[in-house]
Amino acid sequence: MLNINFVNEESSTNQGLIVFIDEQLKFDTSLMALDQQHYGLISKTIQNKLQFRGNYGQITIVPSVIKSGEVKYLIIVGLGNAEKLTEAKIEELGGKILQHATCAKISTIGLKIMSRINRFTPQTFTSLIASGAFLASYRFHKYKTTLKEVEKFAVESIEIFTDNNSEAIKLFEVKKLIAEAVFFTRDISNEPSNIKTPQVYAERIVDILEPLGVNVDVIGERDIKNLGMGALLGVGQGSQNESKLVVMEYKGGSRDDSTIALVGKGVIFDTGGISLKPSSNMHLMRYDMAGSAAVVGAIIALASQKATVNVVGVVGLVENMQSGNAQRPGDVVVTMSGQTAEVLNTDAEGRLVLADTVWYVQEKFNPKCVIDVATLTGAITVALGSTYAGCFSNNDELADKLIKAGEEVNEKLWRMPLHDDYDAMINSDIADIANIGNVPGAAGSCTAAHFIKRFIKDGVDWAHLDIAGVANSNNASALGPKGAVGYGVRLLEKFIKEYN
């Protein structure tokens, strides 16, 4: 685990020293002094425009020319246009610095910031750099019996010196709690599905949330059946592992404060059921529960901070498997709301799980708004790729606040349309609703959203976040390795705490 230390006096024992320069390549007094201390190494690096231009995210590591002391490298980092810096961009710089230092095998890093960088105070700037580096330090190696040399090395520490360290520490401690919640979400998402059965996943939720003061109720199939959740049970009926409904209630606000409900799709593994998926990349269906993991992670983040909000989270944990008892295309299920649903495609299972879970949370908790998070459709990935998650909502203000929160933490949302024409496409000939649209290949993410919308009560503000394209990545990003991204934790935490 990367150690982030805020110190009261500058140290010369770090192997690497971070230097920030914007695209204007101008030196302030402190940078001039540092350059002189290193015999003009920084200015010489800048003079070589082919080597360093100060562009945002450009990082050049040069060996120190000082023979005495521990500093062996200067890590020169481009800020680009400092006026265009955002919190998200600064965090990404922290992640990039850690990645470059790891490649260069620099085990300890020092950072000194004593003055504002554009609108950011030294305390805010350094806490964001530290947060980005901490997020980027995540690894999932628990099942590797041997590690490659490149995997063995990890940066040990970043030592930060600035004035008013107590303020910087306070800011970073909150960001670290949020990052640790992201790590839980990444961990449980990366976990192989033979390990994270619905029962095991539910136990892990209990283990991490109950010590934080969150009331957790794990509901088994007998009680799920008594609740009338035929849609959820239908998805899981082909699996040997019992489906679970996990209800998490965090009461950090007053009795008079309204409740926000978070609902997550928790399909532990999705074969597609009888409507079998292609075998290529089916292993990635371990991530089909990433929506539920985002919900759990957001509640961890809020509860660990003792945030003064009231939040309830509900996740339906199921496996969509084949067997002699599996749900068939053409089956009709009765949902908890009493509406009947025709299952035309067993691989459109997530919306069936969500239909019962969003209805349950409205019936029991009467929330101010409901936000569901799900890796719901491949269609959203076709539309938005891995840059944006899709946001569907019946309330413009809610959608705008979610999008704004996402921008601030670099978890982007794109507003997608709801329309009566899409709703008409999911009418069934023999039931109240069909689980896919009646025009093959058309508006798949929109018809899926409308399916969920059929189970939202009048007067309830609702947003549906389709995170299928952003939940996991085949490539490393500035803030983490390939695999589970942990998308949604920081977005939901930011929205609930600051925009609610």
From Swiss-Prot:
Gene3D superfamilies: Leucine Aminopeptidase, subunit E, domain 1, Zn peptidases. Mn(2+) 1 binds at residues 270, 347, 349. Its cofactor is Mn(2+). Pfam families: Peptidase_M17, Peptidase_M17_N. It is found in: Cytoplasm. InterPro entries: Leucine_aapep/pepB, Macro_dom-like, Peptidase_M17_C, Peptidase_M17_leu_NH2_pept, Peptidase_M17_N. One of its GO terms (cellular component) is cytoplasm. This is Probable cytosol aminopeptidase.
